[in-house]
Amino acid sequence: MSVTFTPETFGWIMEVVPSRGYKLDVRPYQISLDDVVKTLQYLKHHHEKYYALYRLMIEGGLRLSHAVYVMKMFSPSEVVEIPEIYLETPRLVCFSDKGFCRYYVGVRESQKPCEWAYMSIETLELLKKFAGNNIDRRTVTRYAIRHGLLAPKYMRKVSWRLMVKVIPREVARFIQSRFGELKISEARYEDLLSEADNYYPKYLEKLRELVYSSHVSENSEQYTSSQ
């Protein structure tokens, strides 16, 4: 049996029956580099352990949970095998002449993986100082809020915005383990690892220029992100 509605009835139905709404989940926010600099400066002088975590996050694009994991489980001399390329390697690989290291994290059985943690030599020294510490990430976030600092979750976002200015996006995705956006074959993995090693010093240079510099007043650029 078919039912026919008059135009008047159809119009009434459209008015009184709620329609299903779809909303694009884009949450723009402003991140001031001044806030990044002030946060790092405050932590450097008041909480060096959290300062080390923040540096890990901004230098490698790590999530707080992964930065905490790296600090707790830091085993630089351990030898591991990278599944994609069947290569045995020390967890910690340093390029002293280029001023950086990468540490194999190898967190994979998660929706939020973390393959490598790239960091400067200076951050490595901080990491060594606090290695083995078990930190509650909620405590870090509460500390940041209490002292008016940039929340930890924003450091990865700042890292991404700065990194893609000087590094090809595919390589930046590899460094930050954004594998949901990047499909890697066995051969390509080794290529990306090599490219990441070549490009990463450019990112550290950009960080030193915009973030680690003491000239806070010059770093007022705003970054809008929906990552």
What are the functions of these language-model segments?
Residues 69-121:
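Conserved tyrosine-mediated DNA breakage-rejoining catalytic core shared by Y-recombinases
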Residues 17-38, 98-99, 110-122, 132-135:
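DNA breakage-rejoining catalytic core of tyrosine-based enzymes
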Residues 33-64, 156:
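Basic, Lys/Arg- and aromatic-enriched nucleic-acid-binding interface segment
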Residues 1-17, 61-65:
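N-terminal DNA-binding recognition helix of tyrosine site-specific recombinases/integrases
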Residues 53-54, 65-70, 172:
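Alpha-helix N-cap/helix-start motif at helix boundaries, enriched for small hydrophobics
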Residues 133-183:
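Short, basic (Lys/Arg/His-rich) helix/loop patches that form interaction surfaces
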Residues 176-223:
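Catalytic-site neighborhood detector that most strongly recognizes the C-terminal catalytic loop/helix
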